[in-house]
Each structure stands twice: as C-alpha cells, then as structure tokens.
C-alpha cells in the first residue's frame, strides 16, 4: 500500500483538483485498512470535478489484484474499460462494444452506469462484488437499482470486481459494431475534459440544446464549452474548479440541465 500527498488535478481527466492524501491499495486486506477512516474512491478520474481546495478524506485508488481480469470470470474494478472492450473484441466476445471510448475504470463505470446510446455498463453485468461495512458482498445487477447514469450502491460501497455477461460472436460482427460506435463519437473534443457535462433530458440531447442557445465557446478563465460538442466543458490549460462551476452555473441559467459529473467534496 502506498500513501502520498498529491494534487488531484494530476489524476482527473479534466485536469482540475486540489490536494488530497492518496491511498493506492493492491489487496483486499489493504482495502480493509484504508477504509478505517473517512474515504472517497478514485477511478480513472473521468466524470469528476474536484474543488480547488481538495478533499479532507482519504482518496482510495484500486491497483494490484483489483486490476487483474478474466473475461469469462472475475474482472477487477481497477481495470481500464477501454482495455476490456478491446480484449473482448479480440476474444470474439460481444457485450461491451457500446462502451467503446469511455475513459473509465470498471468500478467507476459500474457506479455511474456509464454508457452511450449504444449501451450501458449495467447491460454487460452478471454480478457485482461490493465492499461495505467491512466485508465483501456479491449482488446481481437487479439489486443495485441501475438507471440512467446512476446506481444505488450500499452507503460507502466500493465496487471491487464484476462478472461480465458476454456472448460469443464473429469478430467481424463485433468490429463492425465498434466502428459504428466510434463514428458516432468522432465529434467529441480532444482537449482535457471530464466527459459529458450534463445529463440528457428525456428524449433530448443536452449538447444540441446548448448549441441551439449559442453557448458553444462560452468561457470562464480557461474553462470553455467545447466548440466541437456542446455537452463538453474543456480545460484550455490552467482551468480551476471555480471557473468550471461558474460556467456550469451560466449554462444552467439558460437551460434546466442536471450536472452529470460527481463533484468533490
């Protein structure tokens, strides 16, 4: 187990965030020890806005045994989702194609039910192991209340591993599906971002609504509504959380959109 003081801007895809004590755990016993004081869990740092003052709690990151995987068995929650998508395709296993391009670890993808219009994480789950109240518990997906970009994990629960529901299919068919998903994601920005900023209202596109209001390019400090896709806030270099939050506020003055990101603290 490694404990160090860090700036969380170096661990988030938006490149924003203040100081914290980072606990990198590699075994189940280390995880038990790390959770003996108040904590938060950090995955790949996407879909997350950390405030400039940082967080007082321990920040736990899963490594070691939590990054091992077997596509036909248990998959560690610290495994990168893009890696799994590619490995499944190579093995001729279908079920993850709709998650192509999501820069998450498995645990974070489960917690927020990450997805695209082509599919959600919950669709690919057979079982989920969650650590809470000092023990490891296995749940079926139906017990975790998955919905649009959300789940209902037990309070303080940490996803530790999952079993995937994959089907054998011809590789050519899987690759065609992945190419379709990739084409749909081409308009997304290449600059630092935390992913889609706002949840899509029922039957509508948040990005399209933002575009129609002429908000693309709106900027506060180095935080800007992407010119490429209205539902992305990008970091032009030195953005701070306060800049991002002010930008969010200005968008929400114009449109009744719900922020999709988690905000710490």
UniProtKB/Swiss-Prot annotation:
It catalyses: UDP-N-acetyl-alpha-D-muramate + NADP(+) = UDP-N-acetyl-3-O-(1-carboxyvinyl)-alpha-D-glucosamine + NADPH + H(+). Its cofactor is FAD. Disulfide bonds: none annotated. Residues 15-169 form the FAD-binding PCMH-type domain. Pathway: Cell wall biogenesis; peptidoglycan biosynthesis. Its EC number is 1.3.1.98. Its main location: cytoplasm. GO terms for cellular component: cytosol. Keywords: Cell cycle, Cell division, Cell shape, Cell wall biogenesis/degradation, Cytoplasm, FAD, Flavoprotein, NADP, Oxidoreductase, Peptidoglycan synthesis. InterPro entries: FAD-bd_PCMH, FAD-bd_PCMH-like_sf, FAD-bd_PCMH_sub1, FAD-bd_PCMH_sub2, MurB, MurB_C, MurB_C_sf, Oxid_FAD_bind_N. One of its GO terms (biological process) is regulation of cell shape. It is found in: Cytoplasm. PANTHER family: UDP-N-ACETYLENOLPYRUVOYLGLUCOSAMINE REDUCTASE (PTHR21071:SF4). This is UDP-N-acetylenolpyruvoylglucosamine reductase. It comes from Thermus thermophilus (strain ATCC BAA-163 / DSM 7039 / HB27). The lineage of its organism: Bacteria, Thermotogati, Deinococcota, Deinococci, Thermales.
């Amino acid at each position: 187990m490694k404990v160090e003081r860090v700036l969380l801007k170096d661990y988030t895809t938006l490149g924003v965030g203040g100081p914290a004590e980072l606990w990198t755990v590699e075994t189940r016993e280390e995880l038990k020890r790390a959770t003996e004081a108040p904590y938060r869990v950090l995955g790949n740092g996407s879909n997350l806005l950390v405030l400039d003052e940082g967080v007082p709690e321990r920040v736990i990151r899963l490594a070691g045994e939590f990054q091992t995987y077997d596509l036909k068995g248990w998959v560690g929650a610290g495994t990168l989702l893009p890696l799994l998508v590619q490995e499944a395709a190579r093995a001729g296993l279908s079920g993850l194609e709709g998650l192509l391009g999501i820069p998450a670890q498995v645990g974070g993808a489960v917690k927020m039910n990450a997805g695209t219009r082509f599919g959600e994480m919950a669709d690919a789950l057979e079982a989920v192991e969650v650590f809470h109240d000092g023990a490891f518990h296995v749940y079926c997906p139906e017990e975790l209340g998955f919905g649009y970009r959300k789940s209902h994990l037990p309070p303080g629960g940490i996803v530790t591993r999952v079993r995937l529901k994959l089907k054998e299919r011809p590789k050519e068919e899987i690759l065609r599906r992945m190419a379709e998903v990739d084409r749909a994601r081409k308009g997304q920005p290449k600059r630092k971002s935390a992913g889609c900023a706002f949840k899509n209202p029922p039957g509508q596109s948040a990005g399209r609504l933002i575009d129609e209001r002429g908000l693309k390019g709106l900027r506060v400090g180095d935080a800007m509504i992407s010119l490429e896709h209205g539902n992305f806030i990008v970091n032009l270099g030195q953005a701070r959380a306060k800049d991002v939050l002010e930008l969010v506020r200005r968008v929400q003055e114009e449109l009744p959109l719900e922020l999709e990101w988690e905000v710490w603290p």
